[in-house]
């Protein structure tokens, strides 16, 4: 009987380890160049390439799961996936709910974009994605916050006149401004927010978080992380 119980215990542990070696990475799939869905219907972008390399270095099999931004932390906590890699800035408020790895991008500025340079940023209507560091910042100003579920909707709100400007990560806004043929411009000063972007894990998964944290460090040490930052975010983006 003891041998049977021991065999069952060993099998259970083996199954647990096997399950832990398949990691479900949760991302939004709607925030280029960090993450987006390509023409083949696959997750693509900076974080797809980064995540695949981190899984390789951590010796784990990974699969990608997409989830709307406004429920991305609750659905991590409830077990829909095992980690978030979705352009999520490290903030004290989020650290109360999840544990982060070290950052895989340095703190990057946020910026305002609008249809003209004479926008009232302090008293106007400013669009931002729900649950972001940008939406939290707007509430500390005199502006009226207009929140949307996706980043594309925040830009559309400016284009159709619902909002005077949008506040978002500058890396996200740069290609939109550059491709607008002058219709959209940056307004005001860049705003440093957050502590850089990291992977988020359930507080009950410290071992998994540690493996990915170590993998991020190896990419910093050998320069491959900087190479990915330049490739996807541009030469002017902060790097390590």
Where are these regions (language model features)?
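Extracytoplasmic small-molecule ligand-binding "clamshell" domains
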Residues: 21-88, 222
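Short helix-initiation/N-cap motifs at beta->coil->alpha
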Residues: 48, 64-74, 130-131, 146-160, ...
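Extended ligand-binding regions for polar small-molecule ligands
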Residues: 48-57, 116-125, 129-133, 196-235
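A conserved helix-loop-strand patch within extracytoplasmic ligand-binding domains
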Residues: 60, 89, 94, 100-146
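Ligand-binding clefts/hinges and TM-proximal coupling segments of bilobed small-molecule sensing domains
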Residues: 61, 133-153, 186-187, 216-240
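A ligand-binding cleft/hinge motif common to bilobed small-molecule-binding domains
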Residues: 71, 88-97, 164-193
């Amino acid at each position: 009987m003891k041998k049977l119980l021991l065999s069952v215990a060993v099998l259970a542990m083996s199954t647990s380890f096997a399950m832990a070696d398949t990691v479900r990475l949760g991302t939004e799939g709607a925030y280029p160049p960090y993450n987006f869905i390509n023409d083949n219907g696959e997750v693509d972008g900076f974080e797809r390439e980064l995540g695949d390399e981190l899984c390789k270095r951590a010796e784990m099999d990974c699969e990608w799961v997409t989830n709307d931004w406004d429920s991305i932390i609750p659905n991590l906590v409830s077990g829909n996936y095992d980690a978030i890699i979705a352009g999520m800035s490290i903030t004290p408020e989020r650290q109360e709910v999840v544990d982060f790895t070290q950052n895989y991008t340095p703190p990057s500025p946020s910026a305002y974009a609008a249809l003209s340079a004479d926008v009232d940023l302090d008293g106007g209507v400013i669009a931002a994605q729900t649950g972001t560091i940008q939406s939290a910042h707007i509430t500390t100003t005199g502006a009226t916050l207009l929140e949307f579920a996706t980043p594309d909707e925040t830009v559309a709100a400016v284009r159709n006149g619902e909002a005077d400007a949008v506040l978002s990560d500058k890396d996200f806004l740069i290609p939109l401004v550059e491709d607008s043929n002058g219709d959209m411009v940056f307004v005001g000063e860049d705003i440093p927010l957050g502590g850089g972007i990291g992977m988020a894990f359930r507080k009950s998964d410290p071992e998994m978080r540690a493996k990915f944290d170590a993998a991020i460090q190896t990419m910093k040490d050998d320069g491959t992380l900087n190479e990915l930052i330049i490739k996807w975010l541009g030469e002017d983006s902060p790097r390590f």
